[in-house]
Amino acid sequence: MPCGCRSPDFYAMKTRKLAFCGIVACLYAVVTLVTSSFAYGPIQFRIAEVLCLLCLFTPTAIWAATLGCFIANLFSPLPLDLLFGTLATLIGCIGTVKCKNKNIWLLPLPVILSNAVIVGIELAVAFYTRELFWTGFAISAAEVAIGEIAVLYLLGVPLMQVLRRTPAGTYLRTL
């Protein structure tokens, strides 16, 4: 290859990663919007959060889930979600990548904790007075954590266990 030129495989890989990001981001946004009656608010069961665990297979999923979360949060009744909800997803996904060689039951913890803390603060700021901030934060963080635990442990971990054993999981590791 001449100096400065890239192989066709390099461009094919970039295209596959970009397509993967687009598909996962779209899935995240669509699933959140279809389930919006219970995907937003203090007690939320955001089924699309399962896609954050795809970071187990490829770090490319960090950007895919974060973009999907941002798009979904464009429709949130709480404008602060655009910044704080998206930040919580980004931090949770990065934490998942850092934990990927650990026990599969520990994988959801970064996503659960980042959402509970960051979205808990967001909800406390939005819905509680200054005097009740810490009480509001504790309540909001617990509510968000309960929803995240339910979704990630009841749907996410079993799905990741299945993906680990299938050709799809092997393919995802190549991205």
Predicted regions and their residues:
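Cysteine-centered motifs
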Residues: 3-5
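Hydrophobic transmembrane alpha-helices
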Residues: 12-56, 60-63
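Membrane-embedded alpha-helical hairpins and interfacial helices in multi-pass inner-membrane proteins
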Residues: 37-42, 50, 70-175
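Short, structured active-site "lid" loops
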Residues: 67
